[in-house]
Curated annotation (Swiss-Prot):
GO molecular function, one term: L-malate dehydrogenase (NAD+) activity
Identification of the protein by name: Probable malate dehydrogenase 3
PANTHER family registered for this protein in UniProt: MALATE DEHYDROGENASE (PTHR23382)
Residues forming the catalytic site: H188
Native source species: Dictyostelium discoideum
Record note on quaternary structure: Homodimer.
Biological processes, Gene Ontology terms: malate metabolic process; NADH metabolic process; oxaloacetate metabolic process; tricarboxylic acid cycle
Length: 333
């Protein structure tokens, strides 16, 4: 077991997603089975007693990887010295709230957290934003965090990728572990583009393109895409609560692969700072296919685009540009 202890911050730590996520971290699913961790758990003041109960459960679980815990409602205390920041907490969209109102409320939150990262966190802190609208919240945090590399800011689209892989596996009648390189492009919203074209399935006959294994182009270009785009809303309709355990699993997958690396030839989807790849404007947090090694990601280059893909990527790009414009206006107020 490593003697080095890493400091890991989870915001919104008393919430549903965090309740599943915290124990994934404790078990070593995120950073490996020999990495000791000091957990920083942040929530609003009225939730601190709930955090105390979670720490009791961590203690009662006797997790050998947990070196220490910090529970706090103080931003400075929470962000001090953190190596990894998982920003789950955000203002939820309430009934009757316009999207602009949601962007304004969250711009204020993530401006504060971006500044806190710059002032108190480790200078190479790696940041994953989960709270929605995740792409634009991540951008606000990045813009507000002077001195921290922009490539250190990411947002979660791995849940969408996992949903897409699962739909392909169900349609093909295979185990989800045999489905590879399904991509999510763009925004973590209903405009996202789930892309099967570069994906393949490991069948008994060998590596098989998804379009060959599933001979149903109408489904692949229609129902598959819309099912993944609307899956979050479908979970809420059925459960009366948003996705929690599946979101925690996706957060764990995202951080694990970013820190420990992806398998050879494997693509994963991450919302990252656009460098102009695939015609996406620079300065957006946009979901791309990436490969990870040595704690860094690189955007997969050279993938071919058909007309459908170009159109769907343009749609989600337009939405992100509009979100960015609105959010930055609020920042300047």
């Amino acid at each position: 077991m490593s003697n080095e202890v890493i400091n890991v911050l989870i915001t919104g730590a008393a919430g549903q997603i965090a309740y599943s996520l915290i124990f994934n971290v404790c078990k070593g699913d995120m950073f490996g089975l020999d990495q000791r961790i000091k957990l920083h758990l942040l929530d609003i003041p009225q939730m601190v007693d709930s955090l105390k109960g979670i720490v009791m459960e961590i203690q009662d679980g006797a997790y050998p990887l947990i070196a220490d815990t910090v529970i706090t409602a103080d931003v400075k205390e929470a962000f001090t010295g953190v190596h990894y920041a998982i920003l789950v907490g955000a203002m939820p969209r309430r009934e009757g709230m316009e999207r602009a109102d949601l962007l304004k409320a969250n711009a204020a939150i993530f401006k504060v957290q971006g500044k806190a990262l710059a002032e108190h966190a480790n200078k190479n802190v790696k940041v994953l934003v989960v709270g929605n609208p995740a792409n634009t919240n991540a951008l606000i945090a990045q813009v507000s965090a002077n001195g921290i590399p922009k490539e250190n800011f990411t947002c979660l689209t791995r849940l969408d990728q996992n949903r897409a892989k699962s739909q392909i596996a169900l349609k093909a009648g295979v185990n989800v572990k045999d489905v590879h390189n399904v991509i999510i492009w763009g925004n973590h919203s209903s405009t996202q583009y789930p892309d099967y074209r570069c994906g393949y399935i490991n069948l008994s006959t060998g590596k098989t393109p998804i379009s060959t294994a599933i001979k149903d182009e109408k489904w692949l270009q229609g129902e598959f895409i819309s099912t993944v785009q609307k899956r979050g809303a479908a979970v809420i309709a059925a459960r009366k609560l948003s996705s929690a355990a599946s979101a925690a699993k996706a957060i764990t997958d995202h951080m694990h692969d970013w820190v420990l690396g992806t398998a050879e030839g494997e693509y994963v989807s991450m919302g990252v700072y656009s460098d102009g790849s695939y015609g996406v404007p620079e300065g957006l947090i946009f979901s791309f296919p990436v490969k990870c090694a040595n704690g860094k990601y690189t955007i997969v280059q050279g993938l071919q685009m058909d007309d459908l893909s170009k159109n769907l990527i343009n749609l989600t790009t337009e939405e992100l540009v509009a979100e960015k414009t609105t959010a930055l206006q609020f920042l300047s107020e």
